[in-house]
Each structure stands twice: as structure tokens, then as C-alpha cells.
């Protein structure tokens, strides 16, 4: 799944991912109570964890 960040996010190493960056979801973890967290990676290879409220997903049909 691909998406865009909806706000600035700082990863565990202190690297900031800016609002509007294109990201890919690599892995999804269920946290319980209908909450989920994903492992995302930016186009430049920066990995970060985030809940799905910080990502707007891009959905498109196959051509």
C-alpha cells in the first residue's frame, strides 16, 4: 500500500519525515481495540512506525 504522510513525523532515530512524503506500508500490526500500526518506508529508505491516522492512502486500480 502506498500513501502520503498527513503531518510531520519523527522516527525513533530522530529523523523527521515531512508532511506530504510518499510512503509504502511494509507491515501491519494489530494493537487491539480496532487500532493498527504500520511499518512504513519513504522513497529515500527511511523506516518509521506510525498509526494509520498519520497516513492518507493512495488507492488506484491496476491499468
Predicted feature locations:
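SH3-family beta-barrel domains
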Residues: 1-9, 29-30
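Short, surface-exposed secondary-structure edge patches
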Residues: 12-16
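Conserved beta-strand/loop element in small beta-rich adapter and peptidoglycan-binding domains
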Residues: 17-28
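Residue-level signal for functionally critical sites in structured catalytic/ligand-binding pockets
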Residues: 18, 33, 63
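General N-terminal targeting signals
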Residues: 20-22, 34, 40, 57
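SH3/SH3-like beta-barrel superfamily modules
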Residues: 29-47
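Intrinsically disordered, low-complexity, charged/polar segments
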Residues: 41-63
Amino acid at each position: 500500500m502506498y500513501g502520503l504522510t498527513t503531518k510531520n513525523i519523527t522516527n525513533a532515530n530522530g529523523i523527521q519525515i515531512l508532511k506530504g512524503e510518499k510512503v509504502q506500508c511494509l507491515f501491519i500490526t494489530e494493537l487491539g481495540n480496532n487500532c493498527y500500526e504500520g511499518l512504513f518506508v519513504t522513497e529515500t529508505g527511511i523506516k518509521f512506525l506510525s498509526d494509520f491516522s498519520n497516513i492518507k492512502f493512495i488507492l488506484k486500480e491496476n491499468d
